[in-house]
């Protein structure tokens, strides 16, 4: 047990970046390399069971003390539509590389706080993603919510869009934490 503690009791990059930052090298990965990698990974996954998408919605109205995520703290909801527009532009870049319509078997909205976005704008985002993609029969669609801003309208809209899982990310029940 002490060897495990010794092995893992060190600072390291967050699991959300791969390859992890210490392994990045300037000019080691060309645009052509990236495109080939995207095409190969999406095509292989799409043919087997469909692709999994994670969409990062980085906005929050308040800072959680435990948060280590990439986020932007703001109460300005005018950021929603421009951000969604850019996500959909990026999605179109991926689609342009493919010769077949992707099948989405998993979609996760993470953050930040995805329910920072209005239900109407979340609908615009999800409709934009599925405009040029198929939803797998048993697709797993999930999102991270926050009890302070997830409304009944959020729940209704996301359910109607096919979302079947929500995570509220309780970190600890100790109020001092």
Regions found by a protein language model. Give the residues of each.
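Flexible, acidic/Gly-rich N-terminal and inter-domain linker regions that tether
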Residues: 1-52
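Canonical Radical SAM [4Fe-4S] cluster-binding loop centered on the CxxxCxxC motif
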Residues: 50-83, 161, 171, 175-176
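Hydrophobic faces of well-ordered beta-strands that scaffold small-molecule active sites
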Residues: 51-55, 105-107, 139-145, 166-168
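Conserved, mostly hydrophobic/aromatic
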Residues: 60, 87, 109, 143, ...
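Short loop/turn motifs at secondary-structure junctions
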Residues: 63, 100-103, 137, 162
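Glycine-rich anion/phosphate-binding loops
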Residues: 78-88, 147-153
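A short, N-terminal amphipathic alpha-helix
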Residues: 87-97
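Conserved glycine-rich "GG(E/T)P / GGGxP" loop and the immediately following alpha-helix
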Residues: 98-133, 141, 146-157, 175-177
């Amino acid at each position: 047990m002490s060897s495990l503690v010794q092995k893992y009791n060190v600072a390291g990059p967050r699991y959300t970046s791969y390859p992890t930052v210490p392994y990045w090298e300037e000019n080691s990965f060309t645009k052509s390399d990236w495109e080939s990698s995207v095409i190969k990974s999406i095509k292989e996954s799409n043919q087997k069971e469909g692709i999994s998408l994670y969409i990062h919605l980085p906005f929050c109205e308040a800072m959680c003390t435990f948060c280590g995520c990439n986020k932007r703290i703001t109460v300005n909801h005018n950021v929603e539509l421009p951000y969604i527009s850019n996500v959909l532009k990026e999605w179109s870049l991926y689609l342009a590389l493919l010769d077949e319509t992707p099948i989405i078997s998993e979609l996760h909205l993470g953050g930040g706080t995805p329910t920072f976005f209005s239900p109407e704008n979340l609908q615009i985002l999800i409709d934009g993603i599925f405009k040029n993609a198929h939803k797998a029969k048993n697709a797993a669609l999930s999102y991270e919510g926050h009890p302070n801003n997830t409304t009944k309208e959020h729940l209704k809209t996301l359910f109607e869009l096919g979302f079947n899982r929500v995570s509220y990310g309780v970190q600890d029940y100790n109020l001092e934490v």
